[in-house]
């Protein structure tokens, strides 16, 4: 996963982001360009957490979007819907 993240994130952000993904059990999907959103978070019916981020984003926008979506996951776990 680190080698994949290296293509999309600034070098210094790869390890911390990987730790966030691992800690929160995120299934990360890097998807093709969507006009209406940069990324999204959803809890799947089986209880797993899925974060999608557009592959077309620059490294810094990708980083901000990934952290933003993981924050949605943390808020969901803390406060519920």
What annotation goes with each model-predicted range?
Residues 1-64, 73-81:
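Active-site-proximal or metal-binding-adjacent scaffold patches in catalytic folds
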Residues 69:
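Walker B catalytic acidic pair
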């Amino acid at each position: 996963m680190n080698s994949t993240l290296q293509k999309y994130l600034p070098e210094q952000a790869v390890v911390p982001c990987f730790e966030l993904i691992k800690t929160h059990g995120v299934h990360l999907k890097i998807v093709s360009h969507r006009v209406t959103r940069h990324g999204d978070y959803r809890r799947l019916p089986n209880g797993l957490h899925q974060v999608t981020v557009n592959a077309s984003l620059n490294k810094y926008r990708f980083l901000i979007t990934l952290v933003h979506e993981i924050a949605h996951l943390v808020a969901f776990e803390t406060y519920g819907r």
